[in-house]
Amino acid sequence: KPDGVFLGYMLGGDTLFELRTSLLLAEQERQGGLSNHVSPMTDTRDVSSLLTRAQFTLQTVDMDEIVVHYPSMYELVQDLRDMGESNAVVNRRPYMHRETLLAAAATYQALHGTPEGHVPATFAQIFMIGWKPSPDQKKALRPGSASHSLKDVL
């Protein structure tokens, strides 16, 4: 619909980088190989490109990070399962050995743990908005065409 708005939200960027790096390091050490155990994430540039390809105008894409602290990696993983945020990657190892999981939890605590004994989990939120084109829609002005300086206003 002309001049229709699209509002979107998704997790992306470096979401769960602490968990991702801990799992990769433990798996490399214990099993001699790597498998993705956290779903891949997109970044703001990809979201902007997607909005452009979908022919949205007047786009804005913003990102904010939230850090949530958990008692250990196990509570974080349980929360992710409860949210239905299990790994959706098709070509991955179907399970992780117990010793690898224990090593990942120890690595997580050693690399990212707080003095209080908690582990942080970073969630990078991507917010997006775009408008469908319309003949009456406002157009962005040409750079440098302003009649007043921002310095004068501030």
Task: List the predicted regions and their residue ranges.
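Helix-to-beta-strand junctions that scaffold the AdoMet/dcAdoMet cofactor pocket
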Residues: 1-2
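Conserved catalytic/acceptor-binding region of the Class I
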Residues: 5-73, 83-94
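C-terminal lobe and adjacent flexible extensions of AdoMet/dcAdoMet transferase-like proteins
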Residues: 54-57, 71-154
